Each structure stands twice: as C-alpha cells, then as structure tokens.
C-alpha cells in the first residue's frame, strides 16, 4: 500500500510564510514555505501563528518561478468522480496562484507586463478541463503494472512511485520531490479523462471505469507538436485503460495512441489543412526505434493501426510509417494500414467491421488483464493496439471504442455477467452509458490537444453517422481553424511554461514575449479591408456609366483578392506562433 498523501489541508498565510497544515486524523505535520528565502521545511501545528489568515485547500499542485518571483499553486475546489476499489478519485476544478512576494514595486513596467502574461499562461493551462488526483491510489499506473510491483515499490509515496509520463505537475513539484519528509504533501496530478459508472446487466452489478492518461512528454497543441522528439516521445500520446470490477474480480484492457513516430511537422500557415513536412535530414530510424523500444518494454507487443489517408497529402506519412516498421523488422510489431475516410465514405460506417474482423485474431492473442476475487492473476495483456490518425483524435477514438467494446464483451462473459450468446450491443441501458462515456473521452482528448470537441462523436454516441453530426463537425472544424491559426502559439507557450520546458529568467536582457512584427502583419490586412470596402462602395454608388462602375469594381476587387493571396502566401507571418521555446523548423 502506497504511503497516502494528506487529504485534509488548511493553508495559513502570514506576510513571512505559507503554512500548509495536515488535518487528517492523527496528523501533526505542517509544511512551511518561507516567502523570502523560499526554503521548504517541516514544522508542527503549534508553530502556526494565530494571526495567520486561514483557508481550506485540497492539495498542493506545486510552485513555479515567474518574473516577480515564486508562486504557490493550490487546489481550491474539487468534485468527486467516484470510488475506485474503495479509493476516492477527485477532479480538481479550481486553483489559486499565490505570490511569495508581497509587492511588485521591484519590477519595471516591461517586467510587470511579462509577469502578467506568464500568469495568464499559467491560468490558461489550469482552466483546461481534466486534472484528476487521488490521495490514496496511484492513478498513473495501469492495473497490470500495479500487479507487477515489489514490496519496496508498495511502500513508496505516491510521488516517488508515479509513472512520470503522466504526472503533469512533476515540474511544479520539483522542490518538494527533493525532500522525502514532505512527500505526503506532494500530490501527483493526472491530465486526461476519467469516468466511472455503476452498471447492471442481467441483474448483476459491476463498476465500469474509463481512464485516459495524457503524456507530459512532447505535450502541446495540434499543429505545433507532431511526430516524435530525439528521445522517441510521440506527440499527443495517450494511454487509455478500460476497467471492470465485479464481485472482487478486476479486468482491464489498455490501448495507446500517439502521433506517427517519425520526424515530421505541419505548421499552421492560414491554409485549412497545412501540408505535412517530413524531415529530410533527421535520423528517423533512431527516433522510431527509441519510441518502440520503450513501448515494447512497457506494454509488450504492438499492433499498429494507421488510419490516415493512403492518398493525397497524408500518403507520404503512411508510406514512411510502413517503411519504418518493415525496416525495423521486429517480431513484436504488426502494422495495419486502414484508410478510414476511403473505407467509410458516403457515411458507410458499417464498413469499420472490416477492420475489426481483420484484427480479431490479434486481439484475442493480446488478451486482457484479469485478477480473480482472491487476488490471483488469471490473465495478462500481452500487448496493445497503438492507433493513430493525423491528430490521433477523431478517427482514432472511433476505432478505440470499438476495440474496447469487443474486449469488454469477452471480459463480461468470462466473469459471468453476460450469458453465452448475449451481445453487449443488445444491452440498451449499458450501451447508452458506454457510448456516451467514449464520446466524452473523445471530447476531452480533443479539447486538450486541438482546442475543440472531437469530430465524429455522433457515431460514438449513437452507433451511426447523422447529418446533424456532420453539421457539428463543420462547426468544430471552423473553431479549430481559428484557434490553430490565431491562438495556438499562446496555448503552446502556456503548456511549455507549465511543464518546465521553458524556465523564466527575470535577468534576461530581452523579453521572449516581445517579438516585433513584420510590416506585412498590419499593412496587408489593412490594404485588403480597404480594397474590399471600396469594391462594395463602388457597387452601391454607381458611376456615370456602367463601364466606369465596372472598371472601379474590377480594380478594387482585383486589389482585395490579390492582397488576400499575398497574405495566404505569407501565411506563417500572420499566425500566432510560440515564443518561449525555440523549435526547429521540422521537429
């Protein structure tokens, strides 16, 4: 049993110190943070001055250094998601960012503005839905990983034993990590999605749980973070685990998703779908092998399902992926290319059964994890499906939900919940819960990476494609276009700051936030708007002859259209690009 983190906390604030008091039964510990020296020590309750301003909090997210100095981030609101084998799982819904400094008089005007921007970035990440924690259970590991642990591992604190891929506040907790005596105040927080449901089929009650864990390695937003880095970390990597708990028995099925693991980029440039660029100089095999070496160590066999188009701009990526798998020649990897859009065109989504039939035997070989009510491991999952499309969102989620349902069917039959011959699809009440949960999972993952809800969720929710769903997809696509081009630079900077990819240095001579804009940034849009306005005016206020009117309209019309295409040609100068972490042209 892991050493639990403190659940009941009070924050006492004085001009000199922050005191975080543990209020659990029998606890006397008080975490003390000196607001001047930033020193972290352990005290007892009698050391808290009675003059301190006191408030309840629900956890320490960590500390961060900005231009004005250090800040303490605490969880101020939480909601209960559910209970997980008698462990309560919480969702953090509100936070406070508290400055160590009592005044900002030591800052220049530029520093004040930069500090304000950095705080806005921090709050932007904190306002993204999907931060989860438990004070008694390790959410970062799958059931199977937790079953293969040593007694020493079991005695570690939650922070020490957590899978660092999924601890989103790992950078913020670095000061507390260095001092084992304060680890019970350090709360590892997961980012992703968790839902829990008590369900009934044939009068038999069971708990059904869905957990998606987003990796904090190579984290970022849709168009600015693609492919892999030099260490083999894939963009938008998410581990999704589906769990069943029935009569003391526990079963789980794990899948992963992640960007195509070669060096490629797709930077926004005002076009609806920027052209993907595959690096011509990077050592693709080195990064590719690093990625799959780690995946095989963690998960076992890899069945890769590549859902991207096999023609057009996506074709070179599909060919590169297939070539890499073939060149590596690993017996632990199987590669399946399934052109989702081609196979399911004209709303023929029933054709997804072709893919399910193709991988059915492989899925049976991979199996799932199962522990009986006596705690004995009955079955191990021997590998995972690693699915991807371009974003690893919409198409990927549809396929993952279908694979998970097939595994769940087998698990519930083995546990005796489903009778022989019964189909999960026929259990209307459970099907509604199942489909909505997977659609909610899709939306959460999409909002965290692309900035909007997922596309194609009408199929996930209802089992069929609808015209209303197509309209909603169009609306979400428009919002994605705007965000990807005009706000994602700020979003990427926010994530880099939060995760520690960028460290603030108040002594920096030049502010990284101050990036001068080229003359084109203001001049060309103004020229286009003026030209378009003049074109409309000439149409409304006709000249003496129609030929004169036509000449004016053509002149201003050509000027506005010409300027529009010049802006499009120079698209990268007009998008909101990241400013904090200098990224290579092709990552």
Swiss-Prot record:
GO cellular component terms attached to this protein's record: AMPA glutamate receptor complex; endoplasmic reticulum membrane; endoplasmic reticulum-plasma membrane contact site; glutamatergic synapse; Golgi apparatus; Golgi membrane
InterPro entries referenced in this protein's UniProt entry, alphabetically: SAC_dom
All residue ranges annotated as the SAC domain in the record: 122-451
Coiled coil: none
Cytoplasmic side: 1-520, 570-587
Span list, region Essential for phosphatidylinositol-4-phosphate phosphatase activity: 452-587
Catalytic reaction list: a 1,2-diacyl-sn-glycero-3-phospho-(1D-myo-inositol-3-phosphate) + H2O = a 1,2-diacyl-sn-glycero-3-phospho-(1D-myo-inositol) + phosphate; a 1,2-diacyl-sn-glycero-3-phospho-(1D-myo-inositol 4-phosphate) + H2O = a 1,2-diacyl-sn-glycero-3-phospho-(1D-myo-inositol) + phosphate
UniProt topological domain (Lumenal) ranges: 542-548
Compartments (UniProt record): Endoplasmic reticulum membrane; Golgi apparatus membrane
Cited PROSITE patterns: SAC
One Gene Ontology molecular-function label: phosphatidylinositol-4-phosphate phosphatase activity
Modification type N6-acetyllysine: residues: 456
EC number of this enzyme: 3.1.3.64
Bilayer topology: Multi-pass membrane protein
Self-association and partners: Interacts with TMEM39A. Interacts with SEC23A and SEC24A; this interaction is reduced in the absence of TMEM39A. Interacts with PLEKHA3 and VAPA and/or VAPB to form a ternary complex.
Function: Phosphoinositide phosphatase which catalyzes the hydrolysis of phosphatidylinositol 4-phosphate (PtdIns(4)P), phosphatidylinositol 3-phosphate (PtdIns(3)P) and has low activity towards phosphatidylinositol-3,5-bisphosphate (PtdIns(3,5)P2). Shows a very robust PtdIns(4)P phosphatase activity when it binds PtdIns(4)P in a 'cis' configuration in the cellular environment, with much less activity seen when it binds PtdIns(4)P in 'trans' configuration. PtdIns(4)P phosphatase activity (when it binds PtdIns(4)P in 'trans' configuration) is enhanced in the presence of PLEKHA3.
Record protein name field: Phosphatidylinositol-3-phosphatase SAC1
Species this protein is from: Pongo abelii (Sumatran orangutan)
Lineage per the UniProt record: Eukaryota, Metazoa, Chordata, Craniata, Vertebrata
Gene: SACM1L
């Amino acid at each position: 049993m892991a050493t639990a983190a403190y659940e009941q906390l009070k924050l006492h604030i004085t001009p000199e110190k922050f005191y975080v008091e543990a209020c659990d039964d029998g606890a006397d510990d008080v975490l003390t943070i000196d607001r001047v020296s930033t020193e972290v020590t352990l005290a007892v309750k009698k050391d808290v001055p009675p003059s301190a301003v006191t408030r309840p909090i629900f956890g320490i997210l960590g500390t961060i250094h900005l231009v004005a100095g250090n800040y303490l981030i605490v969880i101020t609101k939480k909601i209960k998601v559910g209970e997980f084998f008698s462990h309560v799982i919480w969702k953090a819904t509100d936070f406070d960012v508290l400055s160590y400094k009592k005044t900002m008089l030591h800052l220049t005007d530029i520093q004040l503005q930069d500090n304000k921007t950095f705080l806005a970035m921090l709050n932007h990440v904190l306002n993204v839905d999907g931060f989860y924690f438990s004070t008694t259970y390790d959410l970062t590991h799958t059931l199977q990983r937790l079953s293969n642990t040593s007694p020493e591992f079991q005695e570690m604190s939650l922070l020490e034993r957590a899978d660092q891929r999924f601890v989103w506040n790992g950078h913020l907790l670095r000061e507390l990590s260095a001092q084992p005596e304060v680890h019970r105040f350090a709360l590892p927080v997961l980012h992703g999605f968790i839902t829990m449901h008590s369900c009934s089929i044939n009068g038999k009650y069971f708990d059904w749980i869905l957990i998606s864990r987003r990796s904090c390695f190579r984290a970022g937003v849709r168009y600015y973070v693609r492919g892999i880095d030099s260490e083999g970390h894939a963009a938008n990597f998410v581990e999704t685990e589906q769990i069943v708990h029935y009569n003391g028995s526990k079963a789980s099925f794990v899948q992963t998703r992640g960007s195509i693991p070669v060096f490629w980029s797709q930077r926004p440039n005002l076009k609806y779908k920027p052209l993907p660029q595959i690096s011509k100089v990077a050592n693709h095999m080195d990064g590719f092998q690093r990625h799959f070496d780690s995946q095989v160590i963690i998960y076992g066999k890899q069945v890769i399902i590549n859902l991207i188009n096999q023609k057009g701009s996506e074709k070179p990526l599909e060919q590169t992926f297939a070539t890499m798998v073939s060149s590596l020649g690993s017996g632990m990897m199987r590669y399946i290319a399934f052109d989702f859009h081609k196979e399911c065109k004209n709303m023929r989504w029933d054709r997804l059964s072709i893919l399910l039939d193709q991988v059915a035997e492989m899925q049976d070989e991979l199996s799932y994890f199962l522990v009986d009510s006596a705690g004995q491991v009955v079955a191990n999952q021997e590998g995972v499906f690693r699915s991807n499309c371009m974003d690893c969102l919409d198409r990927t989620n549809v396929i993952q939900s279908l694979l998970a349902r097939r595994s769940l069917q087998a698990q519930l039959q083995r546990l005796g919940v489903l009778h022989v011959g019964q189909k999960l699809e026929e259990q209307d009440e459970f099907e509604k819960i199942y489909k909505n949960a997977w659609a909610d999972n899709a939306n959460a993952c999409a909002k965290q990476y692309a900035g909007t809800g997922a596309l194609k969720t009408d199929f996930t929710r209802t089992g069929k494609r609808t015209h209303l769903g197509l309209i909603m997809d169009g609306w979400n696509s428009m919002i994605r276009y705007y965000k990807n081009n005009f706000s994602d630079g700020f979003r990427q900077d926010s994530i880099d700051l939060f995760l520690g990819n960028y460290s603030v240095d108040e002594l920096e001579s030049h502010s990284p936030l101050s990036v001068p804009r080229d003359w084109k940034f203001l001049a060309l849009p103004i020229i286009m708007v003026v030209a378009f306005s003049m074109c409309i005016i000439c149409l409304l206020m006709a000249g003496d002859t129609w030929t004169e009117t036509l000449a004016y309209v053509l002149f201003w019309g050509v000027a506005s259209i010409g300027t529009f295409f010049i802006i499009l040609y120079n698209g990268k100068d007009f998008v909101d690009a990241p400013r904090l972490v200098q990224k290579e042209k092709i990552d």
